[in-house]
Amino acid sequence: KTGDIIKKTHPDVKVIYTRTTDTYLTLHERAEIANRNNADLFISIHINALDGIHTARGFQSYTLGRGETTGDKGLKMNADVAKRENSVIFLESNYKTVYANLNGNAPELDIMGEIIADQNRERSVYLSRLMQQEVCKATGRQNGGSHQNNLAVLRLTKMPAILLELGFISTPDEENYMNTEDGHTKYPMGFYNAFIRYKEKYDNS
């Protein structure tokens, strides 16, 4: 829905989807679509889940980085997030070649082989924070914060990139909201409002 709104209100913006069906694409393929089309921005939309935990809540966004939480507990939290998001790598037959520089299952992660461009990092973080503001305002969902972590699909892209976690499907009330017409309307509106604020800031830079 967000793409449709953007197309109608800003015909100058070309919206490219990595997929429009439930057909599985590897993380590498998703990033490659963006890179091949020289995209100015990459947004990956996900639904969160925690096994055996039914109380976790919140809309979250991620940009590429080492993870801002420190200490032994913090390192484990950072690693757990990266492992959840990167775990699909191991479903790919050639993952050892494609992701040679990314260990998605290590307890301590060597996150960045190269430091991403300052401009991309700055823009990614800015959009991440806008998403937190606008999506939570539109939906009334709990603000889970803007975070940094070693997520493969972000590392593989060559432009400002963010990953969004709409909520926890493992928490009944969050799952219920994501399946309502209200959720289907207000999440896209929040995405759109954040995108427009981002576009206004960086359109000609």
Model regions and ranges:
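Active-site-proximal helix/loop segments of hydrolytic enzymes
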Residues: K1-S205
